[in-house]
């Protein structure tokens, strides 16, 4: 599968052919929410469109996806949804799906709007992650996995590992892995997700669930989700207006 050229090894044409089934070609981006913790920056602007260091937050993710040759990208919008159309100037291939239920429901309601898009291997990403290492979006994926980094203690959503697979998904823990909002799901697991999301959403209070809790907690037995470990600095999570100001100040100084 490898050929040597000018003292460098490259994947041969036959090797690339073998990799084709594992090439990721689709991504879904969750961008419907209000981002209340970022007020006043989000008073008139969706959090993913807030500018940091000369670039809008979502553009760092979009650029990473494009670098991995992924252009089948659907963005689920809600709050100030018309503003996302400005992205088409640089990313004309984007598709938009509206979720007006974001006001009263959790992000599982966004996934319910794109069940028909879960018919092949797919990245599912949060839109408000400031990606500093584009390499975390890999062109090829071989199994379902979720991005995370090790931490001794956290109050955020996290998980532990059992034989390299995600277990004990909860908010807050010690000696665990902090969840980053980028995951990949195989074609087979996407089909399972379609079924499980619909089942959980139909339950009382189902609309108040985080979608990630469906495969990682409520229906965990149906999946084997591997950790794809990254470094904390690969993504900057901006969870408050104060954190936004601090990052902008670092850029100025």
Annotate each language-model stretch with its function:
Residues 2-29, 55-122, 205:
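Conserved N-terminal catalytic core of the sugar/cofactor nucleotidyltransferase
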Residues 4-27, 180-253:
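Conserved alpha/beta core of the MobA/IspD/sugar-nucleotide pyrophosphorylase nucleotidyltransferase superfamily
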Residues 18-52:
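Glycine-rich N-terminal loop/short-helix segment of MobA-like nucleotidyltransferase
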Residues 31, 77, 126, 148:
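Short beta-strand/turn micro-motifs composed of small residues
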Residues 37, 60, 83-86, 113, ...:
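Phosphate- and divalent-cation-binding pockets in alpha/beta enzyme and binding domains
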Residues 48, 93-95, 224-226:
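Conserved beta-strand segments of alpha/beta enzyme cores
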Residues 132-205:
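Conserved core of the sugar-phosphate nucleotidyltransferase
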């Amino acid at each position: 599968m490898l050929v040597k050229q000018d003292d460098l090894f490259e994947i041969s044409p036959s090797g690339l052919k073998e990799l084709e089934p594992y090439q990721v070609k689709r991504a879904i981006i969750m961008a419907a929410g209000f981002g209340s913790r970022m007020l006043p920056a989000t008073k008139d602007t969706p959090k993913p469109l807030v500018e940091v260091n000369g670039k809008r937050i979502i553009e760092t993710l979009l650029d990473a996806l494009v670098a991995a040759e992924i252009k089948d990208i659907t963005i689920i919008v809600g709050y100030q949804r018309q503003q996302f159309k400005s992205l088409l100037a640089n990313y004309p291939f984007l598709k938009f799906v509206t979720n007006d239920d974001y006001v009263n429901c959790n992000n599982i309601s966004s996934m319910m709007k794109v069940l028909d898009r879960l018919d092949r291997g797919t990245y599912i990403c949060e839109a408000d992650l400031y990606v500093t290492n584009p390499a975390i979006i890999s062109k090829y994926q071989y199994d379902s996995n979720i991005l995370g980094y090790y931490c001794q203690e956290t109050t955020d959503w996290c998980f532990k590992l059992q034989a390299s697979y995600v277990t004990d998904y909860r908010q807050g823990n010690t000696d665990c892995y902090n969840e980053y909002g980028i995951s990949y799901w195989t074609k087979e697991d996407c089909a399972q997700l379609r079924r499980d999301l619909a089942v959980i959403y139909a339950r009382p209070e189902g609309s108040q669930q985080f979608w990630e809790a469906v495969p990682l907690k409520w229906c965990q037995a149906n999946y084997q989700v591997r950790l794809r470990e990254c470094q904390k600095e690969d993504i900057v999570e901006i969870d408050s207006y104060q954190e936004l100001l601090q990052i902008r100040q670092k850029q100025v100084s």
